[in-house]
Amino acid sequence: MEKPWSGRFKEETDKFVEDFTESVSFDKELAFEDIEQDIAHVKTLQKAGILTEEEARELIQELLKIKEEIKEGKFQWKKELEDVHMNIEAELINRLGDVGRKLHTARSRNDQVATDEKLYLKKEIKEVLQLLKELRKTLVELAETTVDFVMPSYTHLQRAQPIRVAHYFLAYREILLKDSERLMDTYRRVDELPLGSGAVAGVDFPLDRFYTAELLGFNRVTRNSMYATAERDFIIEFLSNCALIAQHLSRLAEDLIIWNTEEFNFVELPDKLCTGSSIMPQKKNPDVLELIRGKTGRIYGNLIALLTTMKALPMAYNRDMQEDKEPLFDTLKNLKNMIKGMTLVLSDLRVKEQNMRKASGNFLLITDIANYLVEKGVPFRTAHHIAGSIVAYLLEKGKKLEEMTLEEFKQFSEKFEEDVFDILSPERAADRKRVYGGTAKEEILRIIEVAKAEEGL
């Protein structure tokens, strides 16, 4: 089959080269964006007087037919034509002859593919943002149902201080909100039209690039043709955002996996989202959460792969950049499933509030003892030392903090009074954290209302 660039060559392309260099097996994912761009390019060529009205009409008509054939799975992709762009153009030439041969006027595959990818990424960013919004809504709804429950917070995976369970879920809602803000910021940089930059230096024809941008829904036009065709920073930035989102989902998954163990027994996952063992009949494995955690490494790998591909390329376009698509497509497929999976898990999560509360007393209240002494006029560092001495005493005696008598408290400081027992409750300890952003119930209820308004609940 004759190649679109075959005029300079005297030999046919080796079969190995065709197989090794083809990208249509994966870049056909961009087919609809490529056709959308083709149609806008046709209209721009007509506006510039390069195509007649009739030629433009014929091209657009056939492009729309090809789009339907692709939708229906009837379009025949040929790897010997290398990529999605040449497959569609070759079919136009097959149907329209010389009119089809005019389509690629004032365009290179270099600015064409960058435009396709930006169109694709704009659409996909919006989809990821919507999935994140659904996950955040689920977290807010979960917070509403757990606002009266208390649990231990952890630092170094050691019990720290009592918090309301809702505070935990709202923390992840804040994290995912920042993820969405980063994606929206990335979208702003993606929203820039490369088409009209040609291979590297621009084009010789009087194209109205701002008209093309308007047709394709781009807010801005690239200001340098080399930059427009040489960079894949917009994909790398997006993959970096995805890696952060994956990291956050992985950390949440890790907590839920631990909480689901018999040793913690804080939550129970629904049967429909777990699997069993081929040998151990008792097993109920949290596979969805484990794969969310596992696929995070894959998403990191895709980011590192593209960073490494781009790190030493001479200016401007190089064929190495063909390797940007598979990491992008793979990351999107897996990240979207990870978000959907986490939303499903949280939507049907059973929180075991009694077990959480049982784990929230004793030494988790010792910081409140130190703060109690501070309120009685004891310097904090002294109060901290006294509270630490109480811990050592209780460990030696094999007692819990709640079992101490007033006489025992007074052995450590005369500042202790009967009211010390008022703070020996996980709920009261949590509710003393009334600072803005703290874990007090009144503050959590306020934040829930703010979150519901922001999420449209």
Swiss-Prot record:
InterPro entries: Arg_succ_lyase_C, Argininosuccinate_lyase, Fumarase/histidase_N, Fumarate_lyase_CS, Fumarate_lyase_fam, Fumarate_lyase_N, L-Aspartase-like
Keyword set includes Amino-acid biosynthesis: yes
Subcellular location per the Swiss-Prot or TrEMBL entry: Cytoplasm
Entry EC no(s): 4.3.2.1
GO process annotations (BP): arginine biosynthetic process via ornithine; L-arginine biosynthetic process
The keyword Cytoplasm belongs to this UniProt entry's keyword annotation: yes
Catalytic activity: 2-(N(omega)-L-arginino)succinate = fumarate + L-arginine
Pathway(s): Amino-acid biosynthesis; L-arginine biosynthesis; L-arginine from L-ornithine and carbamoyl phosphate: step 3/3
Protein name as annotated: Argininosuccinate lyase
